[in-house]
A protein has these predicted regions:
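Short intrinsically disordered terminal tails
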Residues: 1-5, 97, 117-121
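Negatively charged, low-complexity tracts enriched in Asp/Glu with abundant Ser/Thr
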Residues: 1-28
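Intrinsically disordered, low-complexity regions enriched in serine, threonine, proline
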Residues: 10-12, 51, 94-95, 116-118
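Intrinsically disordered, low-complexity serine/threonine-rich segments
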Residues: 21-22, 36, 61, 121
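Acidic, low-complexity, intrinsically disordered interaction modules
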Residues: 35-99, 103
Length: 121
């Protein structure tokens, strides 16, 4: 079995909360494989390419990937070519603002925000 019923339901819940973001992202695709389960596939549209894929292990794993992608959207929007570790105070405020609607629906995963931000210098 790829996931227990409980694990799959938890992953599906996270997927539904992030559904619009998942649909609109040009950086990745979330796919289902009958062989390995959910796969996070890094992609690009300009130029068109498929990069790496990794198996989503849990709801927390999917939530972490989605939150990280939301943060990267903010950094791309500001035109700064750096990682979250170098985000300035305004970027951090915007990242936290964009995370809030998701975390309000998934409060059990709020600790992931702290984990992502703890990578900062």
């Amino acid at each position: 079995m790829l996931y227990t019923e409980k694990e799959k339901n938890e992953i599906e819940r996270v997927r539904k909360v992030f559904a619009e973001h998942l649909q609109q992202s040009t950086n990745f695709e979330l796919l289902w494989s009958d062989k390995v389960g959910f796969v996070w596939l890094a992609i690009g549209l300009n130029p068109l390419y498929v990069d790496t894929g990794r198996r989503i292990e849990s709801a927390a794993d999917l939530c972490h990937e989605c939150l990280d992608d939301v943060a990267m959207d903010v950094l791309y929007m500001t035109g700064n070519d750096h990682a979250i570790e170098e985000a300035d105070p305004l970027e951090l405020a915007e990242i936290k603002r964009r995370w809030k609607p998701y975390i309000d629906q998934l409060p059990e995963h709020a600790y992931l925000c702290d984990e992502l931000l703890s990578r900062r210098k």
